[in-house]
Regions:
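Short hydrophobic/Thr-rich beta-strand motif most characteristic of the beta2 strand and flanking loop
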Residues: 27-36, 42, 62-63
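Bacterial C-terminal helix-turn-helix
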Residues: 134-172
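Two-component/phosphorelay signaling modules centered on CheY-like receiver
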Residues: 13-32
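Short amphipathic alpha-helix used as the core "switch/output" element in two-component signaling
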Residues: 62-79
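Active-site beta3 strand of CheY-like receiver
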Residues: 46-57
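C-terminal output helix
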Residues: 110-120
Length: 172
């Protein structure tokens, strides 16, 4: 079974080519970009299941800060799309920062093809599990509100939450 669409963002054309070959048997569609600044527009036009994001784009800079900035941007704009970070300049602190900023996982270059594919599949599967839990919660909340004949205060009381979080959950 092939997964949907992956967006790979890396400034190195050779890396993009290698990843297209490596991931061709796993994904239906592989979109590539040499820079992350065009990704927000692309993400509005193309449905994407996962993003593989390099962490460094400026010549001579290998701190990973650019990747962290774009990771936070993608998480803010498209929280449902998992982002896996990839870099040749990895250290434990950078990986921790990436995970704390919302990355689904972290891969180092050079990568092992099987490990990369497994990591991407796992990230997609985990993101779909979260959506399922949210849909279960939403269904339950709507049933309680219906049972309370639309009385939000009573529904919040039965759910053990205050009205404000209940309103937020109903908006989703």
């Amino acid at each position: 079974m092939k997964y949907g669409t992956i967006l790979v963002i890396d400034d190195n054309p050779s890396i993009l080519t290698a990843l297209k070959i490596c991931l061709g048997g796993t994904f239906e569609q592989i979109l590539t970009l040499p820079r992350p600044d065009t990704a927000p527009t692309l993400l509005q036009q193309e449905p994407v299941d996962i993003i593989l994001l390099d962490m460094n784009f400026s010549l001579g800079v290998n701190s990973g800060q650019e990747g962290l900035l774009w990771l936070r941007t993608f998480r803010r704009l498209h929280a449902n799309i998992p982002v896996v970070l990839i870099t040749a300049y990895a250290d434990i602190q950078l990986a921790i920062k990436g995970l704390k900023s919302g990355a689904a996982d972290f891969i180092t270059k050079p990568w092992d093809n099987d490990e990369l594919i497994r990591t991407l599949k796992d990230a997609i599967d985990r993101s779909q599990e979260v959506e399922t839990l949210e849909s279960i919660e939403s269904t339950h909340i709507h049933k309680v509100v219906d049972q309370c004949h639309g009385n939000i205060s009573r529904a919040a009381e039965l759910l053990g939450i205050t009205r404000q979080p209940l309103y937020a959950k109903l908006k989703r």
